[in-house]
Amino acid sequence: MLDQVCQLARNAGDAIMQVYDGTKPMDVVSKADNSPVTAADIAAHTVIMDGLRTLTPDIPVLSEEDPPGWEVRQHWQRYWLVDPLDGTKEFIKRNGEFTVNIALIDHGKPILGVVYAPVMNVMYSAAEGKAWKEECGVRKQIQVRDARPPLVVISRSHADAELKEYLQQLGEHQTTSIGSSLKFCLVAEGQAQLYPRFGPTNIWDTAAGHAVAAAAGAHVHDWQGKPLDYTPRESFLNPGFRVSIY
């Protein structure tokens, strides 16, 4: 099933790129929480929803662009968790650092994940405890890698005072910044060793990247040391967390 989900992510990426390259208008509007949404978000959402309903008609889907109410999803044990365009701010800035995120959740855990960066044409995927990166038609298994000093990857668009204080206390390290779920993927492929997050995220922002990072050997825990959990709950917000090889 992983190959079909990867192809679905590519199809969604193609729909996004039609807006990104100007073939179709971007049409940026603000949602109720003031976050931006574009025609590309909606186009990718439609592609993924149609594809998953065909691929697995018995598994419900939670997408950022049309999340079901709590009364609908409170008893879900297995479901798809989708962010059709993660990094909308990066998309609007046209820096290429946005992704298509698709994850399969089973009893609170992301057991399959796909993160596709359309501009870079890079696909990260994970299933059955293994993670891969596909680039230029070549697919290879990836895993975490230690480095000294460690490279800490941080958000391009969401810096905060807590993060600054954390980094000051961390000891010797280097930093890099990138948008969207690519932060998880940098840790997964051994380029970075730590991704700390204090600012708010939603479950669709993290599930696919979580699957990839965990399958590559990283730990994805909240600041109390518990694995991020995707068991249905009323709020979509995650706690703060860190993705680490240590």
Curated annotation (Swiss-Prot):
Keyword Nucleotide-binding: no
Bilayer-crossing regions: none
CDD domains registered for this protein in UniProt: CysQ
GO biological process, one term: sulfate assimilation
SUPFAM superfamilies, A to Z: Carbohydrate phosphatase
Keyword Ligase in record: no
Residues binding Mg(2+) 2, per UniProt: 83, 86, 205
Binding site for substrate: 64, 85-88, 205
Catalysed transformations (reactions): adenosine 3',5'-bisphosphate + H2O = AMP + phosphate
GO molecular function, a single term: magnesium ion binding
GO cellular component terms given for this protein: plasma membrane
Keyword field: Cell inner membrane, Cell membrane, Hydrolase, Magnesium, Membrane, Metal-binding
Residues engaged in binding Mg(2+) 1: 64, 83, 85
Cofactor: Mg(2+)
EC number: 3.1.3.7
Predominant location category: membrane
Purpose of the protein: Converts adenosine-3',5'-bisphosphate (PAP) to AMP.
NCBIfam families: bisphos_cysQ, PRK10931.1
Protein name: 3'(2'),5'-bisphosphate nucleotidase CysQ
